[in-house]
């Protein structure tokens, strides 16, 4: 991804890394179990109480990124919570979500998009109410891994910036920031090393919609991308993964590696990194599949 920049303390940024894997045109479901992390079959639906679906957004986004999925789930009778993700640091973001989950009654299906996948992985640990984890174009770290490390694991992300993070991100100081930490904003305009916000993150949405998403983005800190993940909840909680084959941010090949390592049930869909906006029906189907087991 990036080579290290002297100005920013030698730490690279690749908030979500990816190449387009132009494979399946239709949605294809595949169950995958990693060796050493194989889980029992979770195919038989439960008949218990309907779970609450908790949706966690990723970097450069807010809770509104889930709006279409929320409407579909509510129409199907699900209670849905969409708490804010502070985007301040993996440990603190996960602790914030873990505390929030204790306010939810009954079984939970916990869903994370992109960086939100790393957050749910840590936040759900030890919470017996969380019956299923769902990863949407998401990071699925194991203990000791960082988002930055996983983003760089496969080549081809549109966030690579030709090895210079300054081609992709604006580094902005903020009050009380630890030494070497910055708020990171994805640049909106393209340059020779970066296709611009809309074509990178939202390449299957109308350019005007991508422009709005870029203008309204929320920053994530550099530290959030470099902090190491703790013990993963997916070792004890069944998981599902939706991989957009048009994702230019987090390479589908790397998403598959992470999904298989976690023993997740994998579904491919023809969508960009923002599949919950461009293919909300496909995303909702995967969430409801998990909910059928979790209920």
Named regions from a protein language model:
Residues 264-295:
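Catalytic active-site module of serine/aspartate enzymes centered on a nucleophile-bearing elbow/loop
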Residues 245-271, 290:
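Conserved loop-alpha-helix segment in the C-terminal half of the alpha/beta-hydrolase fold
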């Amino acid at each position: 991804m990036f080579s290290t920049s002297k100005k920013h303390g030698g730490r690279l940024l690749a908030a979500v890394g990816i190449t387009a894997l132009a494979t399946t045109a239709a949605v294809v479901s595949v169950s995958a179990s990693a060796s050493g992390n194989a889980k029992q079959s979770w195919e038989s639906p439960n008949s218990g109480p309907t779970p609450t679906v908790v949706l966690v957004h990723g970097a450069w986004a807010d809770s509104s990124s889930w709006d279409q999925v929320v409407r579909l789930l509510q129409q199907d009778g699900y209670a849905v919570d969409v708490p804010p993700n502070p985007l301040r640091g993996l440990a603190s973001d996960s602790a914030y979500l873990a505390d929030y989950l204790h306010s939810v009654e009954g079984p939970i299906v916990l869903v994370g998009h992109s960086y939100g996948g790393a957050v749910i992985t840590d936040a759900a640990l030890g919470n017996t109410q969380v019956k299923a984890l769902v990863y949407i174009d998401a990071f699925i770290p194991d203990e000791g891994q960082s988002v930055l490390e996983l983003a760089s694991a496969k080549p081809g992300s549109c966030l690579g910036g030709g090895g210079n993070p300054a081609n992709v991100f604006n580094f902005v100081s903020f009050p009380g920031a630890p030494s070497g930490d910055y708020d990171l904003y994805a640049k909106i305009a393209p340059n020779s090393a970066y296709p611009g916000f809309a074509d990178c993150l939202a390449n299957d949405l109308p350019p005007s919609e991508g422009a709005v998403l870029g203008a309204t983005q929320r920053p994530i800190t550099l530290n959030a991308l470099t902090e190491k993940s703790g013990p993963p909840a997916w070792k004890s909680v069944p998981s599902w993964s939706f991989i957009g084959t048009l994702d230019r941010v987090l390479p589908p090949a790397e998403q598959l590696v992470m999904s298989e390592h976690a023993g997740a049930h994998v579904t491919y869909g023809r969508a960009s990194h923002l599949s919950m906006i461009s293919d909300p029906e496909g995303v909702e189907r995967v969430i409801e599949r998990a909910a059928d087991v979790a209920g």
